[in-house]
């Protein structure tokens, strides 16, 4: 098997065995959902419903706040109880629409949502993109970038290749793996629809070698389509990061500060492809997603299909509850996931996993001074100098941080993973990135005002 990869990176323990052999289970409808108006990169959405309104599943409840934004739909039928701030899994608190279920799961325009045979080959590029936009599809792998924007590259940017990300390189997570096995046809049709929308000549489905069953099944499914290939990849982190995946699959280098479309590529996730099939073939918006609930801190690890807005507590209860020694719950994997302060936070479009860790796996490490060992530099997939960037950020040296490429950091956590001094490199670099980007925005605003 010809296994490709990128240079550098790390090899953390996989911990996939908890759930990689477990079929997706459907979570019972929640009694209530809390649907954030900010679930994506870009402008937050604007609520178009009011307290006390009756709502049906699939109904638009918040409109896009700009081109780089995404529609939000009701994920259950019932009544709007509140539109106010609630705990958010990424931002601590956020504006949400709380809906109390009527237990009916009654869809809006039910007749239009019944699956039907649709001759999608006759659809235009614009028709597919409109369906995607109307469905509120964002990148389901975690980035949550509005898909209709990705499918609309600027003039002069042509896309020749679609790469479907089936790596799922974060430890513990297996949702994408299970979807490739259980929803294979929808994955492949989604790839073909995205290719048509982009005008892409070919597609490559990148899958890490620790998923041989998925490689085999997807390879069989694409046999009739010579312009779609499967590329097995070495098991390494962060193989699923866009720039690393493009390098491994195509040997193309995305320029510093650039985007995949700069090298004529678009990267999408397995779950995103399925969402496109749902949107185009079934007129079904994004109301649910597969979430891996796993770790030694959960009694019955599972892959769960849950409605957006469902509190984490519901999923954890469905999986038998936390163990007595559970100490931390993350949204996402252990490398890039976010620790949660409450289980009242809801599943959002970017929730790929809920990882429950026990006290034995959480070590309170003492930080020591940097010993200049260079370990962080040797593993950084972006060829940065993490220890220097962290030091610049700590000392508020923003110009130097920008000069040494702090905004190019993808925050994968590889540097912190190998640091023998236990320095919180990613946290410091993240703060530095925020500050540098803030300074950049202010400078652009000033320049715009002065030019007028």
Regions found by a protein language model. Name each.
Residues 1-48:
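N-terminal, Lys/Arg-enriched amphipathic/low-complexity engagement segments
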Residues 50-63, 82:
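Short, well-structured beta-strand-loop connectors
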Residues 78-80:
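Conserved hydrophobic positions within beta-strands
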Residues 87-145, 156, 212, 229:
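Acidic low-complexity segments
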Residues 108-109, 162-176, 297:
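Gly-rich Lys/Arg/Thr-decorated short loops/hinges at beta-loop-alpha junctions or inter-strand turns
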Residues 181-196:
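Histidine-anchored nucleotide/phosphate-binding helix
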Residues 201-312, 318-325, 333:
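Hydrophobic alpha-helical positions that pack around
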Residues 351-367, 375-377, 381-452:
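Ferredoxin-type iron-sulfur electron-transfer modules in oxidoreductases and energy-metabolism complexes
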């Amino acid at each position: 098997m010809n296994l490709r990869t990128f240079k550098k990176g790390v090899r953390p323990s996989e911990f996939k065995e908890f759930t990689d052999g477990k079929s997706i289970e459907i979570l019972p409808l929640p009694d209530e959902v809390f649907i954030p108006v900010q679930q994506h990169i870009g402008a937050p959405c604007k609520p178009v419903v009011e307290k006390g309104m009756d709502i049906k599943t699939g109904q638009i409840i918040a409109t896009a706040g700009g081109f780089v934004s995404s529609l939000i739909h009701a994920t259950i039928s019932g009544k709007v109880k509140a539109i106010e701030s609630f705990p958010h899994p990424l931002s601590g608190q956020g504006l949400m629409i709380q809906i109390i279920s009527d237990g009916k799961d009654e869809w809006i325009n039910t007749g239009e949502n019944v699956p039907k045979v649709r001759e999608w080959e006759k659809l235009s590029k614009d028709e597919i993109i409109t369906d995607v936009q109307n469905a509120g599809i964002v990148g389901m792998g975690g980035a949550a970038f509005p898909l209709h924007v990705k499918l609309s590259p600027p003039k002069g940017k042509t896309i020749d290749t679609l790469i479907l990300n089936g790596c799922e390189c974060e430890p513990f997570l297996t949702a994408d793996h299970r979807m490739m096995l259980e929803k294979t046809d929808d994955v492949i049709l989604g790839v073909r629809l995205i290719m048509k929308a982009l005008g892409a000549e070919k597609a490559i489905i990148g899958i890490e070698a620790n998923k041989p069953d998925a490689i085999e099944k997807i390879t069989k499914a694409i046999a009739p389509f010579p312009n779609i290939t499967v590329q097995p990849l070495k098991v390494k982190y962060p193989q699923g990061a866009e720039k690393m995946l493009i390098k491994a699959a195509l040997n193309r280098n995305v320029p510093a500060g650039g985007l995949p479309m700069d090298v004529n590529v678009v990267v999408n996730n397995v779950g995103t492809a399925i969402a496109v099939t749902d949107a185009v073939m079934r007129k079904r918006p994004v109301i649910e997603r597969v979430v891996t609930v796993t770790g030694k801190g959960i009694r019955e690890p599972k892959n769960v299909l849950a409605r957006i807005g469902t509190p984490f507590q519901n999923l954890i209860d469905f999986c038998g509850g936390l163990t007595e020694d559970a100490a931390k719950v993350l949204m996402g994997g252990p490398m890039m996931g976010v620790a949660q302060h409450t289980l009242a936070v809801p599943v959002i479009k970017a929730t790929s996993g809920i990882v429950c860790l026990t006290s034995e796996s959480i070590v309170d490490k003492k930080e020591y001074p940097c010993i200049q060992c260079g370990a962080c530099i040797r593993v950084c997939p972006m060829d940065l100098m993490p220890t220097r960037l962290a030091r610049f950020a700590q000392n508020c040296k923003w110009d130097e941080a920008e000069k040494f490429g702090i905004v190019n950091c993808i925050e994968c956590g590889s540097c912190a993973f190998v640091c023998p001094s236990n320095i919180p490199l990613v946290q410091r670099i993240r703060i530095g990135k925020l500050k540098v980007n803030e300074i950049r925005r202010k400078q652009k605003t000033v320049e715009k005002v002065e030019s007028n």
